[in-house]
Amino acid sequence: MRKIKIYGLLTCVCLMMQSCLFNEEDIFDESSAQRAIASVNECQEILKGAANGWLLEYYTGEDGEYGGFNVLARFDGNNVIMAADFATDNYEIGEESTSLYKVESYQGTELSFDSYNELIHEFCEPSGYNSPGYAGDYEFVFRSVSKEKIVLTGKKHGVTLIMTPLPAETNWQEKLTNIANVVSQASYVTYKLIVNGQEITKMGQEEHAFSVTKVDETGETTVSLYPFIYTEEGIKMYEPLVVNGVEINNFKWDNENLTYICTDTGVDAKIEFYCPEGYLNYLGNYILQLANGQRIQLELKQKMIGKSFAMNFALSGTPIEFVYNYNMTTDCIDVPSQTVGVYQGYNVLLYPGIPGGNFYADDSAVFQGRIANTDPLTIKFTYVNNPICTLMLLVYQKTDGWYGFSTMFQDVTLIKVD
């Protein structure tokens, strides 16, 4: 295809015209500045005008692919008070955080959370070793503004976000707690989409997005993501699912049947949990074998059906729980970084480490399991981001630094005994 470029020609004028032209430019610049100031003032007043604040549907990742999070925000002209449906290191679900914000004219009218607020900037930072994090934004361009709805676009990643005013009677803590309860109840990883009684496809659930994996005739695998945001009732898709020309957008969570039921008028659809067959194969008793020859017999129990397992034991009198996740892609089990217990009031964390060296405080770290033998079932674990990290370290952080338990889990192997 040929590309056609149109170039504008700048004509020259005589010096005698300079004074007149400068006057015209001054008039134009003043008018442009006035429009910019008016836009800033309008956006600022509308932000402040929602007495009980706004619901910001904050989507992350390129094209919003990682899904949405609910952030409530109230603006007073200088400060913004935020609360969210997720917890961070320093804030619980619904706990308020205050920081500065500004509305200014740059490349259009922009909203910037320019002082640190953990509830927003959490999404804009790398999450650990070789991990880019959620690829979120903290600077946005206003695309449309009204008292009923504000549309923003992230400056860096270009994701479109929607803000709507909260009704005066909305209790922030209650709303966010209700949403968090749905998140907790529905966080299974294997589902199937059923429309008009017919199964359309199997779907994975990865945090706040569904995934559909397909393998073509050459063996090439493609994964499509369908992001959504949790609501007090269930979920709302970022963009509707489309099946045979029918758009499917809103779902209510049925906890008794572990099913998302579509609430769109005239649509018969649901997203129903199913337990992958391979999950059940890992329940049972194991020998936990370490590099130093130590062998501990433990039971791997169901924690969340189809998703996770728990292994419980004690160290120095402290109850410890290792959570293993079922990996449907590899049909094996993985060990993620996690909080495994509490020691003297401090959270005990599992992180990857190097023998005689450092450890990585990487909350996204995963020790991926692989089957080394089938009889008996033997599973070995490797830190996927850096295979030289053969330690699973248990550490806790006090005000004067990090401390670790004397027990180090090196070259961990699980051997099934029943």
Describe each model-derived feature in a short phrase.
Residues 1-8:
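Bacterial N-terminal signal peptides that target proteins for export
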Residues 16-19:
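C-terminal motif of bacterial Sec signal peptides marking the signal peptidase cleavage site
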Residues 21-110, 168-191, 283-285, 411-418:
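Acidic/polar, low-complexity intrinsically disordered N-terminal segments immediately downstream
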Residues 21-32, 146-189, 197, 262-282, ...:
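Edge beta-strand at a domain terminus
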